[in-house]
Amino acid sequence: MLTGDNEKGNAIVSEAEKYLAVPYVWGGTTPNGFDCSGLVQYVCNSLGINVNRVAEDQFKNGTAVNKDELQPGDLVFFEQNGYIHHVGIYAGDGMMIHAPRTGDVVKYQSMETDYYRSQYAGARRVY
């Protein structure tokens, strides 16, 4: 799934791939179970990149990236009613790795669905 020549960003995606199929757990921050921001924080911390714990605060980390300039490893954020409620790790080709919701698992997901397109808030580069 990796695209581009972006060593640090690709390392973030490769690290996140280790946790595919881990169950979603509200408030989860370990490989026993992750919520969306717990996955992002765990992956980044394991690579020596410090990010905040919750998605709304993670949206303040790093530098802003335009959607048409996304690179693998960028953090992508989604909002509803002005509130950042979800974060994923951009994996390239319009896909992200994320922990979506209770009853689901860490997985690849297209960002091009109506749901994610309509709630896209922006992206941050933390590496």
What are these regions (language model features)?
Residues L39, G88, A123:
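Short hydrophobic/aromatic patches on the structural cores and recognition surfaces of FHA
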Residues I49-Y108:
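...with weaker cross-activation on analogous glycine-rich loops/strands in unrelated enzymes
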